[in-house]
Amino acid sequence: MLDKNATRRVIWTALISRRRMKFSIRFLSILVASVGGALPTDAQVNVTQEHNNPSRDGVYIDAGFTPSAAAGLTRDLNSDGTISGNVYAQPLYIEGGPNGPMIIVVTESNNVYALNPTTGTVIWQRTDIGPPVTSGLPCGNISPAGITGTPVVDLASRSLFFDALIDGPTKKHFIYSLNVDTGATNPNWPVDVNATATYNGMAFSSLAQEERGGLALVNGIVYVSYSGYAGDCGLYHGWVVGVPINNPSNVGAWATTAIGGGIWGHGGVASDGTNMFVVTGNTFNTAGNWMGGEAILRLQAGPIFTGQPTDYWAPTNWLNLDSGDLDLGGVSATLINVPGATPSKLVLALGKDQNAYLVDRNNLGGITAPIASANVSNATNRGTSAVTYHTSQGTYFAFHNDGGWVEAYRVTATNPPKIVSAWSVPPSGRGSPWVTTTDGKNNMIVWVVGTDANYGGDQRLHGYDADTGAVIYAGGGANELMSGTRQWNTGIVARGRIYFAADNKVYAFKLPTPTPTPTPTATPTITPTPTPGQITLRGRGKKVHLINTVRLRWSGATSANIDVYRNGVLVATTPNEGQYDDSTGDTGQAQYMDKVCEAGTQTCSNVVTVNFPQ
């Protein structure tokens, strides 16, 4: 008789070896995609997905992007970049193929391009995917509607994946796989989502579902998220469809039980390498029963949703958010690690209610209070992707709200962590930020484009010191002005260049000098410890439940507590957390002059004046 235990040991040894080999390949792909210019110049640089990493952190490592070099950025006028169609999706950058490096860009006309990253000329193109939808949708704000979400690339198989909405007697979403080096459609693709995606007896309907978010590729399955069309029309649901890249006929899906619950954010599906995270919006006709909306959800491979409290979080006021159309899922999920915090592995949601929420991503907790929350915006948070990064000063997240403000907040390494204001810069457009660093720790710069002239955008590139918000790159001159930039879009970084895709064109920006070879050790940028008397105060007004409220944000104070003065009168003493909302009790026209001082002293900030016209 065979030794069954020995046989089991042989089988498990083989499986473990196979899993280790697969993990090594996947880890290498992720490593190559995330380290950018920190690698020697003979190593590959690849930007394969939305915000460069599955966590959607938006960080790009490129040794050339020191603050002094970044200040001299100019547009490469010799780069053509001509394409056809409107662009809402982030471009990608792929190396390692027979044609050399490529910029991959997709458009709402259902066109796909591979461009030479230096000359901007076409390497290959696909203009035969199918006609985009230009009419016949019950509502919406994207027309034509074709390829909206950012694609994803599998380097191992050299495959490009994207979702295209194609017009016809029946309007349909198709998930495509192309050879990234030639543009040819891979065998057994595309996948007809209408025909293959079902969940609990519910069929997918492209007429009700829009695809906006970036695709994710996790352990051999490509995940695509769906919302409704702008206007909340039709019987749409929040959907995540999973397609195994080696067996595309075996389609998996999950959807919200209630109508609504769309996944709206530009980042789409985030992942920790095993599980997927999405944030949903408002639902309808729930009779007060939570049914998948206004929530952070953790999905297992497939996708599979367990329904257990460990795998979802919704605020206790979710029903009020539903009633007010204040989607929790205004911004896509961002995974944040905070060394020293308890818990340290978090997921961020930024809601249309102007709040930020942090939740333990290893145990989301069900319907309960978050680990941390804060009012972080004087305008709606929606549509964009946030970023997260680490400097010598701590862990941050930053985002661009509907009012045009770029806001940065620090997450404290405490038990539990707290959200503390870091800096903000004045309004321009709605683009999603991204971050450069010379080595993963130093010289952090937050970049953003003031997208979409229809929403007050200046259509220029801007760069800010990631610790302080100080301007590093102010948009350039006449040559650096872009046109046709779309709200919520984001740029990428590769080989000492920034690429940003807009309507009918991909713009390339270059550093004034080549990326150093070999990569030098980056010089740390250290912010000095503030000394008394150097308190810097910012303030702006907002209405909170009709009450005149002055939002105060400061830096440089060293005392444990802060005295807050309004019009020369002490109105509050508060912990030194860098922020305080001064609720005046007034509702009409008024002017307020505020300052903050280290408690019990005359070491004070500048005075800020805030006017309320009515």
Regions found by a protein language model. Name each.
Residues 1-23:
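N-terminal secretory signal peptides that target proteins for export/translocation
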Residues 584-601:
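Beta-strand-rich modules
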Residues 563-589:
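Recognizes extended acidic, P/S/T-rich segments that occur
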